């Protein structure tokens, strides 16, 4: 009988600990977002990475990491995180917009064009950026493409 009571106590403690860990997991993204808005990028980056550990399909955490790497001018890491967002949600127009800007910055005409075509199909909250994208894209259009249009 004592063993059964002891076993119940152990199970109770185990479930209490796990429920606290679960509650903590949920707040990683929200805390990271608050720190990001305060421009505390280093600490917010750590919290977004923790959120990804517990929730690998957290497209928002990947997106905020991409924004942090954009701010740090780390194009390689920004692209990795944007690709992760687009793998999780191919219609995330903010990620597509950021990828277009990155590809234009890298003077990658073909990829830029591909993302712009996709952006025109799925734009939702970033449709107002179409003119900005067009102007930036026209600066990298090759001469032979300009004559075809």
Q: Predicted regions span which residues?
A:
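Alpha-helical segment of the N-proximal tetratricopeptide repeat
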Residues: 26-50, 54
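Register position in tetratricopeptide repeats
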Residues: 37-38, 71-72, 105, 139-143
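Canonical tetratricopeptide repeat
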Residues: 64, 98, 132-136
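TPR/TPR-like (Sel1-like) alpha-helical repeat modules
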Residues: 87-90, 100-128, 138
């Amino acid at each position: 009988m004592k063993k059964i009571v002891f076993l119940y106590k152990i199970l109770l403690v185990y479930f209490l600990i796990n429920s606290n860990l679960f509650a903590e997991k949920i707040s990683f993204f929200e805390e990271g977002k608050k720190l990001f808005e305060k421009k505390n990028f280093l600490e917010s980056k750590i919290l977004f990475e923790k959120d990804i550990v517990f929730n690998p399909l957290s497209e928002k955490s990947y997106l905020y990491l991409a924004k942090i790497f954009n701010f740090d001018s780390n194009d390689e890491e920004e692209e990795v995180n944007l690709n992760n967002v687009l793998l999780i949600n191919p219609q995330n127009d903010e990620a597509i917009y950021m990828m277009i800007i990155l590809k234009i910055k890298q003077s990658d005409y073909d990829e830029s064009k591909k993302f712009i075509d996709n952006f025109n199909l799925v734009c939702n909250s970033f449709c107002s950026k179409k003119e900005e994208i067009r102007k930036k894209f026209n600066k990298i259009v090759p001469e032979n493409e300009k004559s075809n249009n």
